[in-house]
Structures are given as C-alpha cells and as structure tokens.
Amino acid sequence: MAEYIHIDEQENCISITLDIEQDKIMAIGEKLNEINEEAYMNGYNWEALFHYYFEQNAPELLEDFDADSEAGMYAGYYYEVSDETKEKAHKFAKMIEALIEDEEKLYQFVRDYGEEIEWD
C-alpha cells in the first residue's frame, strides 16, 4: 500500500485514510483544482470525489460505509469488523491508490464528471 493511504483495523471499525497533505496528493489536488475550480481538494472534496467515483464504479463498497473527513484528511469507515468489511476496505484502498497512481485517469474523471460531483 502506498505511504499516503492507510487502513487501520480497530475492535469496532475499520478506517481508511488518505493523507492529503503529502506532496504527491497536494500536487494532484492542485491539478484537479485547475481542471475544476470547485475542486479545491480538502478532505471534504476528496470525500465528494471518492463518493461519486465509487457510486459509478463500485457501489457495493459503499454499503455499510461512512466517511467523516476533515479539512486536512480524507477518512472513511466500515463500522462493522468482519471478513467481508476487511475485504471491502482493502478493495476501497486499492481503488483509491489506483486512481492516485493513474493521475490521467483521475484528471479525466473530473473533466468528465466534475459538474455532477457535489463539491464542498
């Protein structure tokens, strides 16, 4: 897993966090903001982007999932810990990592759907 994304398994939840203050993530956020001026990429807008992306591409990963981001961090949670939610969390994180690593795909997604995303 890339250094900017973390999965933390607790007794009562599994969290997935994206450190948006890492240089790579900040640079991607600046480019996304150039593409769509509403996409100033704080934690809330990463949440909006990921929510829309997963609705379109893997809605099953949003079942039993909740996000609670802050300005400087994206955070999502599965509040039940089971083999199924552990698997979902790892798939979720891998999809985020794939988007970050394929920047052009991410930029094109925002070009194509940026007006439909409910930015903060």
Give the ranges of each region predicted by the language model.
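Generic alpha-helix signal with a bias toward terminal, lower-confidence helices
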Residues: 28-30, 58, 77-79, 108, ...
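N-terminal, charge-rich interaction modules
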Residues: 1-26
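General N-terminal targeting signals
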Residues: 33-35, 91-95, 113
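Surface-exposed, low-hydrophobicity interaction/linker segments
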Residues: 17-63
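Short proline/glycine- and acidic-rich turn/helix-capping motifs at secondary-structure junctions
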Residues: 48-52, 104-120
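Aliphatic-rich, non-membrane protein domains
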Residues: 3, 21, 27-28, 98-109
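Amphipathic protein-protein interaction modules
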Residues: 46-104
